[in-house]
Design a protein with these regions (language model features):
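Short runs within selected transmembrane alpha-helices of multi-pass transporters and secretion channels
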Residues: 74, 142-161, 169-177, 198-213, ...
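Short alpha-helical transmembrane segments in multi-pass integral membrane proteins
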Residues: 1-23, 81-146, 179-182, 190-246, ...
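Transmembrane helical elements of multi-pass membrane transporters/channels
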Residues: 21-40, 142, 176, 205-209, ...
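N-terminal transmembrane alpha-helices
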Residues: 10-47, 61-76, 80, 105-112, ...
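Helix-terminus/linker motif at the lipid-water interface of multi-pass membrane proteins
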Residues: 31, 35-54, 123-130, 186-193, ...
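Small-residue-rich hydrophobic transmembrane alpha-helices
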Residues: 53-113, 150-169, 263, 276-340, ...
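Alpha-helical transmembrane segments of multipass membrane proteins
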Residues: 38-42, 113, 121, 155-159, ...
Length: 455
């Protein structure tokens, strides 16, 4: 059934309640996406061995590095569509929809080509261990074949989020997630396909979710309707998406680049530490996505209220999203750290792998609330229309700082503990600078409103 896109008003009513109702399905959707990866890792670790587990895990940072630039563009689509929706600009929403879906497909095919043909070279540049690089390359090539569908899902779901719809994408992912788990078991256990099987299961399930979400846009009767016969770029919409999305994508890429450097450092400790790091980071991802739902809520709510000129709501959006994200990080991060050992045993029965994973979780999970707060502050800046500023802050505060840390402190104290400490140090410094920038932007906006009111 087609949905009336005029029902997603995020500018009035009890703001905290709306943020929570918006974020819960979003968090559940993100967790389901992580379950795709978790199913891969658990099935491989249990039924294909620690070498195959390391092969799948060693790809995570590299995949994020290549994908995040274009995922940032989908955030640009979300901001532009939300602002047009808040301003009741139906033509702007329509142009954004057609442009966004086209951009998603084009970027997906580009990533598929680059990822497939450059897989081995990129893994070698990351110092991927020799005993896993063959399997890692195979997994990466198959994974990137499905990239057009992954990008199509990201852009289509971003458009639905812009009008407050986070429930229907959740249903689509639930269906795809069930398919992914079943196919993992069939391909790995029944057909003994190892990493090739889990990669194939992932791209099949992502294709299902992409087709379902895109079908929702096609069935829309309001301005969010997608006309597949008129796909193409609208210059005005494309320019706005790129203005917001490119800096956001570059910021995500900056984080991923520093993670690639850290992954290379992890690789220097051998396949056991790589496997433990892979399992731990997969578990941490559940904490992060729960927090990040409130960062995504912050950018959508801020964008709609900017479009509707409800500037009085902006501070409430920031405070509520910040509170929810920090509390979520504190509760889930602390819980994951306390239950780290039994949770890691889901991924591997090898005690040395579990011990290596715990070394990471005790540092990252207990400080993850800093990352959540940092993301919310950056999202509030983006929603207000400042896209370059949070990118520059992240470039210096995260990428540069982590690179310096790896080149100096980690070289002096060559331990995994000192390596993992680079995360919380960069989070807190970057968050403080984001907060300072947001306060300056807020003051400037208030002064401009006072001047406009006096005219």
């Amino acid at each position: 059934m087609a949905q009336n896109t005029r029902t997603g008003d995020l500018t009035s009513g009890p703001m905290l309640q709306k943020i929570i109702l918006f974020s819960l399905p979003l968090a559940a959707s993100s967790i389901l996406q992580l379950l795709f990866n978790a199913a891969d890792v658990v099935v491989v670790g249990r039924f294909a061995g620690s070498t195959a587990l390391a092969a799948v895990g060693s790809n995570g940072a590299l995949i994020n590095l290549l994908v995040n630039l274009f995922v940032g563009l989908s955030l640009g689509a979300n901001v532009v569509a939300a602002r047009c929706f808040g301003a009741k600009d139906d033509e702007g929403v329509r142009n954004t929809v057609q442009t966004s879906v086209t951009l998603g497909l084009v970027s997906g095919f580009f990533l598929a080509v680059v990822g497939f043909f450059a897989a081995r070279v990129l893994l070698e540049l990351m110092s991927c261990p020799e005993d896993v690089i063959g399997l890692s390359t195979l997994y990466l090539k198959i994974y990137f074949i499905g990239m057009p569908m992954t990008m199509l899902y990201n852009f289509s779901s971003a458009l639905l989020r812009a009008v407050g719809d986070t429930r229907r994408p959740l249903f689509c992912l639930a269906v795809a997630g069930a398919i992914n788990v079943v196919l993992n078991l069939v391909f790995v256990i029944l057909f003994s396909m190892s990493v090739a099987g889990v990669a194939l299961a992932t791209i099949i399930s992502q294709t299902v979710s992409a087709c379902m979400v895109t079908a929702l846009l096609v069935k829309e009767k309001g301005p969010l309707h997608l006309d597949l016969g008129h796909l193409g770029f609208h210059a005005g919409a494309l320019g706005q998406i790129l203005r917001i999305g490119l800096p956001a994508g570059l910021q995500s890429t900056v984080f991923s680049l520093s993670n690639v450097v850290i992954q290379s450092a992890v690789n220097s400790f051998g396949s056991i530490v790589v496997a433990g790091n892979s399992a731990a980071s997969n578990l941490e991802g559940f904490v992060y996505t729960a927090m990040n739902a409130f960062a995504q809520a912050a950018v959508t709510f801020t964008s709609q209220n900017m479009g509707a000129r409800r500037y009085d709501n902006l501070d409430r959006v920031m405070r509520n999203c910040l509170l929810c994200s920090i509390v979520t990080g504190l509760v889930l991060g602390g819980g994951a750290s306390l239950l780290g050992e039994p949770l890691l045993h889901f991924y591997s029965s090898d005690e040395v792998v579990v011990t290596a994973g715990l070394a990471r979780m005790h540092i990252i999970c207990t400080t993850y609330l800093l990352c959540g707060g940092m993301d919310v502050l950056a999202s509030c800046l983006r929603g207000r229309g400042y896209s370059v500023l949070p990118m520059v802050v992240s470039l210096v505060g995260s990428c540069l700082l982590r690179l310096v840390w790896i080149a100096t402190i980690f070289q002096l104290f060559h331990t995994t503990t000192m390596l993992y400490l680079s995360y919380p140090v960069s989070w807190i410094l970057t968050a403080l600078v984001h907060l300072a920038c947001l306060l300056v932007v807020r003051h400037k906006m208030n002064e401009n409103l006072k001047v406009a009111a006096q005219r």
